[in-house]
């Protein structure tokens, strides 16, 4: 089992903000406008003595004719194929969208370790509302409400991640190759 974690979801759910928090660097650009992240970004993180690679992806949009959204979708699919654990991120403020349903079907078909990350749970009401995401039908998938902006819930998220990756904190050479190859890559 590899120690590769992919952060995926629809546009503007906070994937890049969480990525920056996990790698403890501002490597991914964060913006309110969708489509800013177009390729995969790689970084290293560690928690409880376990080191793992984190992949940030652009926002997944199904059946788009936009050339950029098609390329983003390709990058997301590649990240999903590389990952041993998927962080499927949704937005508590917006609630469930049709894109969340579309993407949850893909996640179910992959049959990989997944954690449903209900982001933007910035207060108790939003945290309670995060329970609606169980409607996505991801059975046996833990769901955790977080706020990637202020960091609440990220410790618990990292506990879940570290329980799903192997105990050997050595990364495969492939992980380091990806880090070097994609750190500045874009199209």
What are these regions (language model features)?
Residues 178-187:
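Single conserved hydrophobic/aromatic residue that forms the stacking wall/gate
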Residues 24-48:
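Switch I (effector-binding) loop of TRAFAC-class P-loop GTPase G-domains
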């Amino acid at each position: 089992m590899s120690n590769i974690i992919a952060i995926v979801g629809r546009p503007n759910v906070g994937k890049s903000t969480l990525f920056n928090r996990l790698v403890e660097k501002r490597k991914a650009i964060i913006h309110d406008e969708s489509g800013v992240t177009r390729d995969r970004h790689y970084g290293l993180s560690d928690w409880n003595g376990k080191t793992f690679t984190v992949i940030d992806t652009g926002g997944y949009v199904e059946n788009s004719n936009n050339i950029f959204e098609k390329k983003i979708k390709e990058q997301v699919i590649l990240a999903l194929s590389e990952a041993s654990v998927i962080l499927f991120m949704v937005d508590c403020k917006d609630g469930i969208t049709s894109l969340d349903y579309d993407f949850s079907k893909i996640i179910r078909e992959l049959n990989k370790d997944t954690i449903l990350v209900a982001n933007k749970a910035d207060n108790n009401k939003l945290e309670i509302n995060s329970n609606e995401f169980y409607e996505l039908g991801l059975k046996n998938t833990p769901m955790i409400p977080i706020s990637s902006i202020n960091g609440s819930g990220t410790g618990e998220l990292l506990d879940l991640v570290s329980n799903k990756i192997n105990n050997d904190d050595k990364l495969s050479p492939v992980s380091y190759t990806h880090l070097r190859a994609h750190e500045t890559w874009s199209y």
